[in-house]
Amino acid sequence: LAKNMLLCGTILFGMASCTSVTPDAGEEAVLIHKPYIFGSGGVDETPVETGLKYTWFSTSYVTVSMLPQKFDEKLDDATSNDNTLLDFNTQIQLQVQDNRSPILIKNYGENWYENVIQEQYRNIVRGYISNFGPFDLMSNREVLDSINIAVKRDMENYIASLSQKHGTLPVDVVNVVIGRALPNEKQ
C-alpha cells in the first residue's frame, strides 16, 4: 500500500509540475526556461514547431507566427513637399525566418515590431512622402509605387544594419504598401 501511495504521489507530482506547448500550423513556440532550483535559464535555441511538447511548470513560451504578418500604420499629418498635411494608410509585411524565432525573441523580445521596426518604418515613409507634391501623392500610382520600392529597400538595409550592430534580426521584408494620400480633415 505504501509503495502504491508513493507511486501515485510521484506520478501526480510529475503531472502537476509539467505544462504543454502546442503551436498551431504556421507557428513556432519559443521556450523561455526559468528554473526554480536546478539548470540554467534563458531562451531555448530550438523552436517548438507544430505539435506538442511537455515542459517544466516554470518554463514559459512565446508563440511566433511564421506566416507573413501585416502591420498597418496610419500616418496623420504627413507633410508633402509644399507643406500640405496629408493622411496615409500604410502597411509593411514582415516574415520571421523559419527556425529562427528563438534568435528573434532572444535579441529583440516578444514585441520586436514595436521595439525596433515601427518608428523607423514610419520615419522612412514620412521622409519619402515629403519629396512629392500632394497631387502626385493622391493620384499618381507610379509615384506611390516608387515610394513602396524605396521604403522596402531602406527597411531591408535597416534590418541588415540592426543585425550587425545588435544581433541578428531574422525578419524578411515581404512587401510595403503605401496607400494614396487623403487630404487632412483639419484643413
Regions found by a protein language model. Give the residues of each.
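Hydrophobic membrane-anchoring helix/hairpin
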Residues: T19-G127
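Hydrophobic helical h-region of N-terminal Sec-dependent signal peptides
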Residues: L7-L12
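Amphipathic, coiled-coil-like alpha-helical scaffolding segments used for oligomerization/assembly
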Residues: T79-D82, D87-F88, Q93, Y113-K186
